[in-house]
């Protein structure tokens, strides 16, 4: 007997746009092409097709609105109003975030965007921090890592004597793969809430938690930092963790195990590798872009692939580029707007 069964087929009477896909340089997949133009069938498949129940699938609910398919007006920069502004003015409603960004000079924009996460952290053992720009009232953001909770320095010595003067204790939670084995989003959300409370207590605002990418092999170097080999499980668990931590801190949507350059098909990118990020995009307020090239397009260079992902997922949170390249004034302003909007929403800032 066969080990597989005919699931069904889809016939479209008119076009439907369900994903904002962009053309990519696809690798050749010869085994998926058949000269006869039909898929392989067993002799009894035709009888099963005739007897199968017909079910109509409506794509209208998933069809993207026409306004999202059109390319909007090109961003030409923020227009200043001739006055000096701070982040407190934006928070109190005296000006918009666009006026603040327009008032900032290029040097401070580079400190905020290009130097994000590269400053020494005030929390011992943390990964880093963003620059504190006092002129515009922009505070420093403390960033910590750790797939099983906050990875910080427990014993803090005195700089002169070397003696332990105080301790900061962070809880070590089960590994992401163990939490994912429960298939319980409430459990993962509770873990995120507990980590968020520790973030508020220890002065951390951004947490690079478990890797959102799929677990391709148990022999991976970052096996202990990932959820599962299933993209749906990875996405739902990441969203639950970020949702639990959000009232107190921000869990960053990120993937640290991608190679420097990879070539994948559009279907594999959308349905396997990119699906966890699409699922988790609604629950995450910050995302760290990997400095890698996917089918010749770098995500950190405002590529068509990145713009399509932002449009398809409807993601409007902060984007943090994992690279040191400098950008022009327009690019710096676009990145600074996302960072400042996140700061206005984040707690303890």
List the predicted regions and their residue ranges.
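Glycoside hydrolase catalytic-domain context in secreted enzymes
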Residues: 1-4, 9-349
């Amino acid at each position: 007997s066969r080990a597989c069964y005919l699931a069904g087929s889809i016939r479209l009477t008119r076009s439907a746009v369900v994903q904002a896909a962009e053309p990519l340089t696809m690798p050749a997949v010869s085994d998926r092409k058949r000269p006869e133009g039909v898929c392989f069938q067993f002799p009894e498949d035709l009888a099963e097709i005739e007897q199968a129940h017909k079910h109509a699938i409506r794509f209208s609910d998933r069809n993207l609105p026409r306004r999202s398919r059109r390319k909007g007006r090109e961003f030409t920069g923020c227009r200043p109003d001739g006055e000096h502004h701070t982040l407190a003015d934006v928070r109190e409603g005296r000006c918009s975030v666009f006026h603040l960004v327009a008032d900032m000079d290029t040097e401070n924009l580079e400190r905020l965007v290009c130097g994000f996460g590269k400053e020494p952290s005030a929390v011992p053992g943390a990964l880093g921090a963003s620059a504190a720009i006092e002129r515009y009232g922009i505070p420093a953001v403390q960033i910590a890592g750790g797939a099983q909770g906050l990875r910080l320095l427990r014993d803090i010595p005195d700089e002169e004597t070397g003696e332990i003067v105080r301790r900061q204790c962070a809880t070590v939670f089960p590994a992401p793969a163990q939490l994912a084995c429960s298939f319980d989003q409430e459990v993962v959300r509770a873990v995120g809430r507990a980590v968020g409370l520790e973030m508020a207590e220890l002065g951390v605002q951004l947490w690079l938690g478990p890797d959102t990418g799929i677990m391709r092999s148990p022999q991976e170097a970052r096996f202990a930092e990932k959820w599962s080999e299933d993209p749906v499980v990875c996405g739902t668990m990441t969203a639950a963790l970020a949702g639990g931590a959000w009232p107190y801190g921000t869990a960053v949507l990120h993937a640290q195990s991608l190679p420097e350059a990879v070539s994948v098909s559009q279907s594999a990118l959308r349905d396997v590798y990119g699906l966890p990020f699409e699922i988790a995009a609604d629950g995450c307020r910050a995302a760290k872009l990997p400095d890698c090239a996917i089918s010749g397009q770098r995500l950190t260079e405002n590529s068509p692939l990145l713009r399509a992902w932002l449009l398809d997922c409807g993601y409007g949170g902060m984007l943090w580029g994992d690279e040191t390249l400098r950008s022009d004034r327009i690019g710096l302003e676009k990145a600074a707007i996302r960072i400042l909007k996140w700061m206005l929403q984040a707690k303890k800032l």
